[in-house]
């Protein structure tokens, strides 16, 4: 039996044990993991350094190296996310709804774990911690399959998690890592319907599209983040500048950073040149339409491909429009249904934007950078769903549960 199949079979067995664990037992395990991560920070960083050095040797981009990199603060941030998770209410066993039928049957809809969660992801080793802990909190076994670029970091983190779980009542194999990072292991994971209840891809568009196209296992799609900010003609200048600079430059390599600004022509006539200059001073490369080029000759002419690209770098597309309807059309045409924002003082336009734009998270006068489980108060997240079935947006605890109906009677039979 190969590695993927063996770990799938084991996860199915473990899932039946985890469903019996109490909230207290699960929280004790999470606390142990947080403590062990701090205790073994030096070991994790040493292994992460190997991934970084190999990445540099292979010519990885700065944005990819940033997603790959761990440091003491990022590990502290992981543990803070776990502590938030401990404080959150355990959804397992929660009564979603209850009612009584005329025949005396009492019906309850109860939250239950999904069972076995498969997680396939790229680069970011912090996802290893997020996925493991949020699955444990919700009573799910998890099989992790990271990329070859982060294999040293992922193996170290899972080893640390196993050492933590050894001190608790939860089985070490509640969290398993597929160490084979070849395409064959991924393809096998795609079709493990007998063992996986759901598969969650988290990474670039190519990975996500491949999983959605090839998997026979049910998929919770976490989409790429081709996010936009629309600056309406009534937008406050300083607010617009602050939001765009934050949403693009604070951390350009993440999915909730913006990739296109859509400017109303009337606003751009007054403030566009100054905004472009401010962005360029911060190292942002601008790619715009002909109207943007007419305002600033240093802007590169955008290609059709640019409008649909998640750059994950200091590259920003610029589109000028004459109306909110044109802005909405552009966003719905090229957006990835992740996060979209409008900066405006016109409530009618804001309402139109919220009703018409199709995305998991919509913002008025705020940065798209807040689309994140911790910022939403969910604790660690397992991803940001851009699909419409089961769950949408940052996926916190309830996203990793299903429901079942519990019916109590006193001898009723159907007539």
From Swiss-Prot:
Enzyme nomenclature, EC number: 1.2.1.41
Involved pathway(s): Amino-acid biosynthesis; L-proline biosynthesis; L-glutamate 5-semialdehyde from L-glutamate: step 2/2
Pfam families referenced in this protein's UniProt entry, alphabetically: Aldedh
GO MF, one annotated term: NADP binding
Catalytically driven reaction(s): L-glutamate 5-semialdehyde + phosphate + NADP(+) = L-glutamyl 5-phosphate + NADPH + H(+)
ATP-binding found in the keyword field: no
Enzymatic class: oxidoreductase
Protein keywords: Amino-acid biosynthesis, Cytoplasm, NADP, Oxidoreductase, Proline biosynthesis
Gene Ontology, cellular component aspect: cytoplasm
Statement: the UniProt record of this protein carries the keyword Flavoprotein: no
Biological processes per GO annotation: L-proline biosynthetic process
Stated family: Belongs to the gamma-glutamyl phosphate reductase family.
PANTHER family hit by this protein: DELTA-1-PYRROLINE-5-CARBOXYLATE SYNTHASE (PTHR11063:SF8), GLUTAMATE SEMIALDEHYDE DEHYDROGENASE (PTHR11063)
Purpose of the protein: Catalyzes the NADPH-dependent reduction of L-glutamate 5-phosphate into L-glutamate 5-semialdehyde and phosphate. The product spontaneously undergoes cyclization to form 1-pyrroline-5-carboxylate.
Protein name (database record): Gamma-glutamyl phosphate reductase
Organism the protein comes from: Bacillus cereus (strain AH820)
